[in-house]
Amino acid sequence: HSEGTFSNDYSKYLETQRAQDFVQWLMNSXXXXXXXXHADGTYTSDVSAYLQDQAAKDFITWLKSGQPKQE
């Protein structure tokens, strides 16, 4: 069943790649909208960017694990 293993690994790779592309697209979309920031909103913007990065990393880790989402 080596062909099945390769197909499964390749499918997981493609899913991970699509997820990373999607997250990158989301981050680029959000960054373009927040281009006009005020000085008092800089800290909030930086925290939001950090949280978005962390959420993206957690999401990709979850996708790679192949585990069902826990509710």
Curated annotation (Swiss-Prot):
Any one Gene Ontology cellular component term annotated for this protein: extracellular region
Gene: gcg
Induction remarks: Produced in the A cells of the islets of Langerhans in response to a drop in blood sugar concentration.
UniProt family annotation: Belongs to the glucagon family.
Classification via PANTHER family: GLUCAGON, PRO-GLUCAGON
Keywords, in A-Z order: Hormone, Secreted
GO biological process: response to starvation
Note: X's in the sequence were included by homology with other fish sequences.
Main location: secreted
Name listed for the protein in its UniProt record: Pro-glucagon
Keyword Transport: no
Organism name: Piaractus mesopotamicus
Places the protein is found: Secreted
PROSITE patterns: GLUCAGON
UniProt cross-references to InterPro entries, sorted A to Z: Glucagon (IPR015550), Glucagon_GIP_secretin_VIP (IPR000532)
A Pfam family hit: Hormone_2
Example of a GO MF term: glucagon receptor binding
